């Protein structure tokens, strides 16, 4: 038996016992958190249209479960993280939330996703920038408008129009569905945008093979913002 030497604190609040560095409880928590979040960088979690504040109540839990299940080290939001129903070019529900209330609720939901996924790529969706289009249409200079990352206060997120993983092109999407873009761009495509379409199709040529993946969405289909699609044949 050999008694321990005295323990003391340094300016960095690090314990010293037998001249060996000891982490404080708070530092241990940081290290354990980093270890727990050390997912496989070769696996990517794709999070399709959220349309906050009208995303499904279980969307965040589902995404976190999928990250753990498939050990995903990369996170990509496929666009339309916001809905901006109040500023739609189409008729908005007069009994719905006003612009301020909708934004506050959306930011609250986004905070949950940012806490769960502090580093991510976010593809720009058509709904994300509806207020900018309204401002432009009415002659308001972009100098008066905050960018999306400034408004959301998510410094760990990178906003892009498209992203490539090898030879696979990821986009939010437009009126052209994924398999149409695959044939036009002659590359593999992963796309969001269409809430009622989810599939994988392939294109085989003599010297190449491509695929088109059309993702679904994580919306609450019963929310008033999606009343327009109630009668769609595909749900």
Task: Please provide the spans of the model-predicted regions.
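Acidic, histidine-bearing metal-coordination/catalytic regions of metal-dependent phosphoesterases
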Residues: 1-47
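Core catalytic region of metal-dependent phosphoesterases/phosphodiesterases
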Residues: 24, 43, 47-151
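Conserved beta-strand segments of alpha/beta enzyme cores
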Residues: 43, 119-121, 158, 169, ...
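Short gly/ser/thr-rich secondary-structure transition/capping motifs
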Residues: 57-58, 154, 170-173
């Amino acid at each position: 038996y050999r008694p321990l030497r005295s323990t003391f604190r340094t300016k960095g609040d690090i314990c010293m016992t037998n001249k060996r560095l000891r982490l404080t409880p708070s530092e241990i928590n940081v290290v354990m958190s980093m270890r727990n979040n050390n997912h496989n960088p070769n696996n990517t979690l794709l999070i399709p249209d959220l349309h906050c504040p009208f995303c499904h109540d279980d969307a965040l839990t589902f995404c976190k479960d999928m990250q753990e299940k498939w050990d995903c080290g990369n996170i990509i939001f496929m666009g339309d993280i916001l809905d901006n129903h109040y500023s739609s070019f189409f008729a908005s529900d007069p009994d719905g939330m006003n612009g301020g209330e909708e934004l506050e609720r959306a930011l609250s939901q986004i905070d949950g996703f940012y806490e769960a996924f502090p580093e991510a790529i976010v593809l720009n969706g058509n709904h994300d920038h509806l207020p900018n289009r309204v401002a432009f249409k009415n002659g308001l200079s972009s100098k008066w408008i905050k960018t999306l990352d400034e408004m959301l206060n998510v410094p760990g997120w990178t906003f892009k129009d498209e992203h490539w993983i090898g030879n696979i092109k990821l986009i939010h999407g437009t009126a052209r569905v994924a398999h149409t873009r695959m044939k036009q761009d002659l590359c593999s495509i992963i796309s969001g945008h269409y809430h009622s379409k989810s599939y994988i199709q392939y294109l085989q040529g003599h010297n190449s093979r491509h695929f088109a993946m059309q993702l679904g969405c994580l919306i609450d289909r019963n929310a008033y913002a999606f009343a327009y699609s109630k009668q769609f044949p595909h749900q």
